[in-house]
């Protein structure tokens, strides 16, 4: 049995059932062999809702919605915002985390790395050396 690994501020990986979880509420999002974003609620925001114009006129220093779209990814359990993405219109959602689960499990089994307090680290003997 493995302890959950804290991958980001709001995202945990459980190697026992190979799923992504919300760190805040523990909601199971999706298989860790897929992008965690597929297990999230997604909100598309218009740039002017988030970035108020700095000056009046055409060149306001606010992003142009013809050039950028903003996607926000939320936990379906507690609605914690997990990630935000700025993409060109029509661009597919990016895959920003791809874990080689089989390799990670093999390294943990061999003792090359260990999970301590939710973090991947080297075994104590190597840390002290």
From Swiss-Prot:
UniProt keyword list: ATP-binding, Cytoplasm, Ligase, Nucleotide-binding
Activity control summary: Inhibited by zinc ions, carbamoylphosphate and beta,gamma-imido-ATP.
Lineage: Bacteria, Pseudomonadati, Pseudomonadota, Betaproteobacteria, Rhodocyclales
Quaternary state and interactors: Acetophenone carboxylase consists of five subunits; a heterooctameric subcomplex of two alpha (Apc1), two beta (Apc2), two gamma (Apc3) and two delta (Apc4) subunits assembles with the epsilon (Apc5) subunit in an unknown stoichiometry.
Major location category of this protein: cytoplasm
Catalysed transformations (reactions): acetophenone + hydrogencarbonate + 2 ATP + H2O = 3-oxo-3-phenylpropanoate + 2 ADP + 2 phosphate + 2 H(+)
Gene Ontology MF term list: ATP binding; ligase activity
Compartment(s) where it occurs, according to its Swiss-Prot or TrEMBL record: Cytoplasm
The protein, known as: Acetophenone carboxylase beta subunit
Cofactor note: Divalent metal cations. Magnesium or manganese are required for activity.
EC number in record: 6.4.1.8
Function comment: Catalyzes the carboxylation of acetophenone to form 3-oxo-3-phenylpropanoate (benzoylacetate) in the anaerobic catabolism of ethylbenzene. Also carboxylates propiophenone at the same rate and 4-acetyl-pyridine at lower rates.
Annotated Gene Ontology cellular component terms: cytoplasm
Cofactor dependence: Mg(2+); Mn(2+)
UniProt KW Magnesium keyword: no
First-level EC class: ligase
């Amino acid at each position: 049995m493995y302890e959950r690994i804290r991958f980001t501020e709001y995202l945990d990986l459980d190697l026992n059932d190979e799923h992504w979880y919300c760190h805040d509420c523990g909601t199971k999002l999706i298989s860790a062999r897929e992008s965690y974003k597929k297990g999230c609620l997604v909100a598309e925001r218009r740039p002017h809702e988030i970035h108020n114009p700095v000056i009046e006129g055409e060149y306001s220093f606010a992003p142009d919605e013809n050039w950028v779209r903003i996607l926000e990814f939320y936990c379906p359990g507690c609605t914690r915002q997990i990630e935000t993405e700025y993409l060109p219109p029509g661009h597919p959602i990016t895959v920003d985390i791809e874990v080689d689960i089989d390799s990670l499990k093999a390294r943990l089994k061999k003792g090359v790395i260990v999970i301590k307090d939710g973090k991947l680290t080297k075994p104590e003997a190597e840390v002290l050396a």
